[in-house]
Curated annotation (Swiss-Prot):
This is Secreted protein CSS2. N-glycosylated. It comes from Saccharomyces cerevisiae (strain ATCC 204508 / S288c) (Baker's yeast). Pfam families: DUF6736. Residues 1-17 form the signal peptide. GO terms for cellular component: endoplasmic reticulum; extracellular region.
Length: 232
């Protein structure tokens, strides 16, 4: 039986519009004239902040304390936020300033100002985590799609628990197809790779629009991760 106190999956996505070189262990491709910026989320989570009694998850006030320095890129309509789609390092204090905004929405902009509301951080995302963890623990290898509160999600299970053929058939070329379908308009859509301590893995797309259900990504081309695993 899975326990809430043994996993953590969070996402925080901010549009970045000023250049900073990515570390060598990340492979990304900047967006072109269609306004697509490659999504990379990589951050360290302090799972010790999780409730030990396994009954409570977290409140919005807890979120900044869980984040350490990380790299954040997102799918973005760069015509709204500027044409520079390079990444930037955003430290936890900058994220705190953004998250502490009354409407809890923000983009990291030049000068670390939270001046452009881009994504409402939905804590209902954690309810989706519950659903996915439950289904994967029961050996469900099907693609999962649904909606929770302010956002839509789509989840593709991968190895070691699920046959890689399922993963390849559902994700292969999906990003390109969706990009053509939406004419480059991927505003408010984000991609994650989930790794729960090696017990199960999956790729997850979340967004504010129902188009999320029809989008996918090639993980080999868009690297980044959120650890949702156990701690020693």
């Amino acid at each position: 039986m899975w326990c809430y106190s043994h996993f953590l999956l969070i996402f925080v996505s901010f549009v970045t519009s000023f250049a900073h070189k990515l570390p060598a262990n990340n492979s990304t491709t900047n967006g072109g004239t269609d306004g697509i910026a490659v999504p990379v989320i990589e951050t360290t989570i302090d799972s010790g902040m999780y409730s030990e009694n396994g009954t409570d998850l977290m409140t919005p006030e807890d979120l900044p304390d869980l984040l350490s320095d990380g790299i954040v890129l997102s799918f973005a309509n760069t015509t709204e936020t500027g044409s520079d789609s390079d990444s930037t390092l955003i430290d936890s204090e900058d994220l705190r300033r953004c998250i502490d905004m009354p409407d809890r929405s923000c983009s990291a902009q030049r000068g670390n100002l939270c001046s452009y509301s881009f994504w409402d951080i939905p804590f209902s995302f954690l309810n989706t985590v519950h659903d996915i963890f439950g289904m994967t623990n029961m050996g469900n290898c099907a693609v999962m799609a649904g909606d929770k509160g302010a956002f839509y999600y789509k989840y593709y299970p991968v190895e070691p628990n699920c046959n890689s053929t399922i993963h390849q058939k559902t994700i292969d070329d999906a990003l390109q197809q969706a990009t053509e379908q939406l004419n480059g308009d991927f505003n408010n859509m984000y991609f994650f790779h989930v790794n729960r301590g090696g017990l199960w893995q999956g790729d997850m797309m979340v967004g504010t629009r129902v188009f999320t259900w029809f989008a996918g990504a090639k993980w080999a081309e868009h690297k980044g991760s959120i650890e949702a695993g156990f701690t020693s």
